[in-house]
Amino acid sequence: MQPSSTLAPVAPIIFLAIAIAAINWIDLARGKGKQSVAYPLSLLTTLVLTAWFGMNAATGETHYAFANLVVIDPMANVLSAFCAAGLFVTLVYTRRYLAERDMFAGEFYMLALFTLGGQIVMITGNNFLTLYLGLELLSLSSYALVALRRESRVTSESAMKYFVLGALASGFLLYGISMMYGATGSLNLGEVFRAVESGRINTTMLAFGVVFIVAGLSFKLGAAPFHMWIPDIYQGSPTAVTLLIAGGPKVAAFALFIRVLVEGLLPLASDWQMMLVVLSIISLAIGNLTAIVQSNLKRMLAYSTISHMGFVLLGLLSGVVANKADGAADAYSSAMFYSVTYLLTTLGTFGIILLRTSKGFEAETLEDLKGMSRRNPWFAFLMLVMMFSLAGIPPTVGFYAKLAVLDAVVQAGMTWLAVVAVLFSLIGAFYYLRIVKLMYFDAPVGEEQLEATFGLRSMLSVNGAAVILLGLFPAALMNLCYQAIRSTLGS
């Protein structure tokens, strides 16, 4: 641990704030008659942040800033780099979609960068208030993005649902934080940990605080039964916004769980571990069983997300066995690996869906994917790779991610829970393979061909190659996650 008296550790966050202000000013100064420069400047910003956090991660150092409100450790650097890279890919995938719908404007890119800022603050927070600030920055930006097409009744309705339910979840989280503060007298995660570990705290207040905090966090992660917002928001939002919500925020939510439950409330593991067991089973059940009956593509992927968050929770709950955290690094790194690879696969999936859309046409139903292999065999193959990864079929990275989490669950002595997860995964494979069947064995609807620029084609190809190569050679990324988690647990 290295307390810092300079702003060097948080320089990337400051750079992002300056970049957002600069892009806003430049875009306003150019006026509406000229082409927006927000897109190339946003790409440049995300590239710089990816490289910056990546180089910081290579040092393996941990720094604290702003009176311990912020911690820049290897986990923060690695996850922030992936979030920035994920936004870069998202911006590339969504460019054509936005241009065809008159959404190719500066406000979209500034709000997207604000969501990235919220994710980074969530990942680097070392204080309940800092974490809440990052969460609200992400949430408020997301509300605005969902409502960006003001002329659409569907998106306006989705934004209102998102806002109301998000405010309710924030209230739950704040109430839980207030109870923790009342019991421990501090909002700093390290001080809360030591106060709870001392055993001199009112256990009733702590237990109620944990319940409200886990409920609030589960809403943000998208775990059942706090999942009500996900299907409606995924379906009602413009597909470009759906991708923004479905990707990086899930990685940041994982970091939020680690910061709060592991770094702050680990002595209460016996309380929150059983809560996560219940939440994970419900998420796997509702996500997989409900996705089967969906005909809307984005709604199906929404329920798919819920089931995947169940797997993330499985990794998180496996770190503590009989109140001992001996295998914590392995378990938490498996959940981190799962979150990162889920981001990678989600990007590829929605990238293909965005490619299938056109001006005046939204690829929203499963029927829209019929015969894709005849329109463009390469893009159909990439979609097949993404579906195999989401289903956990080798040799894709999704298979190894599920295997790593299941191994952690078994090592934690909960073999029965691993069996339940496998059974629901087998059920879930049906709706992923149904998409493959539609692409390869059904006749196409319409005559249009799938066309993409060289840049978009290259990005999708790299995305697909990464899903396969990381499935064949997962050791490097798994070791990166393990070292980051081990450093965080030891700091």
Curated annotation (Swiss-Prot):
Entry-linked InterPro entries: NADH-Q_OxRdtase_suN/2, ND/Mrp_TM
EC numbers: 7.1.1.-
Subcellular location: Cell inner membrane
Membrane topology classification: Multi-pass membrane protein
GO molecular function, one term: NADH dehydrogenase (ubiquinone) activity
GO cellular component term of the entry, any: plasma membrane
BP-aspect Gene Ontology terms: ATP synthesis coupled electron transport
Listed Pfam families: Proton_antipo_M (PF00361)
Catalytic activity: a quinone + NADH + 5 H(+)(in) = a quinol + NAD(+) + 4 H(+)(out)
Keywords: Cell inner membrane, Cell membrane, Membrane, NAD, Quinone, Translocase, Transmembrane, Transmembrane helix, Transport, Ubiquinone
Enzyme class: translocase
Transmembrane segments: 6-26, 37-57, 69-89, 103-123, 128-148, 163-183, 206-226, 238-258, 273-293, 301-321, 335-355, 379-399, 413-433, 458-478
Functional summary from the UniProt entry: NDH-1 shuttles electrons from NADH, via FMN and iron-sulfur (Fe-S) centers, to quinones in the respiratory chain. The immediate electron acceptor for the enzyme in this species is believed to be ubiquinone. Couples the redox reaction to proton translocation (for every two electrons transferred, four hydrogen ions are translocated across the cytoplasmic membrane), and thus conserves the redox energy in a proton gradient.
Subunit structure: NDH-1 is composed of 14 different subunits. Subunits NuoA, H, J, K, L, M, N constitute the membrane sector of the complex.
Protein family (similarity comment): Belongs to the complex I subunit 2 family.
UniProt-recorded name of the protein: NADH-quinone oxidoreductase subunit N
Lineage: Bacteria, Pseudomonadati, Pseudomonadota, Betaproteobacteria, Burkholderiales
